[in-house]
């Protein structure tokens, strides 16, 4: 009986401790254009510590001849470096959501939202 009571108390205190954790939240959004001939605008958007919007230019997926794999590679590098900087600053990647929008078959965007959290001090 004492063991069951002890286990119950441990479970209750760990649950309460987790429920009291307060988080800071930060979002980073990658918008990658799928407009032929590289005419679209692709950006990585976040906010700095002062609340100012920061836009990092990304390359468009398409050039005049089709998919530009070097641009895809460059965008992957920029996004990965940005995520690594967030980790270095104590942020944890909590959730990722992606979507695609296209008004017709020749244009559109890929959008990915990265939600980070950090425990408030």
Residue positions per predicted region:
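Terminus-proximal functional modules
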Residues: 4, 8, 13, 18-121
């Amino acid at each position: 009986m004492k063991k069951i009571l002890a286990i119950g108390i441990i479970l209750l205190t760990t649950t309460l401790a987790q429920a009291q954790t307060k988080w800071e939240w930060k979002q980073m959004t990658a918008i990658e254009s799928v407009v032929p001939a590289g005419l679209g605008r692709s950006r990585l958007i976040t906010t700095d510590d002062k609340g100012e919007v920061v836009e990092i230019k990304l390359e468009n997926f398409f050039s005049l001849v089709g998919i530009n794999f070097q641009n895809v590679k460059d965008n992957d590098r920029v996004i990965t470096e940005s995520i690594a900087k967030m980790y270095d600053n104590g942020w944890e990647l909590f959730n990722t959501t992606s979507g695609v929008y296209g008004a017709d078959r020749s244009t559109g965007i890929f959008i990915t939202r990265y939600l980070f959290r950090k425990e408030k001090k």
